[in-house]
């Protein structure tokens, strides 16, 4: 993935911290990152994900994109439905202008 960029990067219910900076770098100029996964506090709600290695720390997604992407929306919430869960969600966009030369075309 290093060196490749995409107009959209979407991650749900997955956290592998060594990849986080690469995910931000993979957002093409004018592109968007949408990320949602479990957060600290989930372990107290009876959720399956309880290992701190797989739970976002408070504000971790905000820290990740700071200085790289513009935050469009962010939540650090406890959901009640369908099952109680602590999650963080972020939608952030590249502030660079989108241009067609940034699109990768595959043969």
State what each model feature region is.
Residues 20-22, 44-45, 83, 101-102:
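Short glycine-/acidic-enriched loop or helix-start segments at secondary-structure transitions
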Residues 52-68, 72-73:
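Short alpha-helix
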């Amino acid at each position: 993935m290093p060196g490749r960029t995409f107009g959209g990067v979407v991650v749900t219910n997955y956290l592998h911290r060594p990849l986080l900076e690469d995910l931000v770098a993979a957002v093409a100029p004018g592109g968007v990152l949408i990320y949602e996964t479990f957060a600290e506090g989930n372990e107290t709600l009876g959720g399956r994900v309880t290992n701190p290695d797989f739970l976002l720390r408070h504000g971790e997604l905000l820290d990740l994109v700071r200085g790289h992407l513009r935050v469009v929306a962010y939540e650090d919430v406890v959901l009640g439905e369908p099952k109680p869960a602590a999650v963080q969600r972020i939608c952030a966009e590249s502030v660079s202008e989108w241009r067609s030369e940034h699109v990768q075309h595959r043969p």
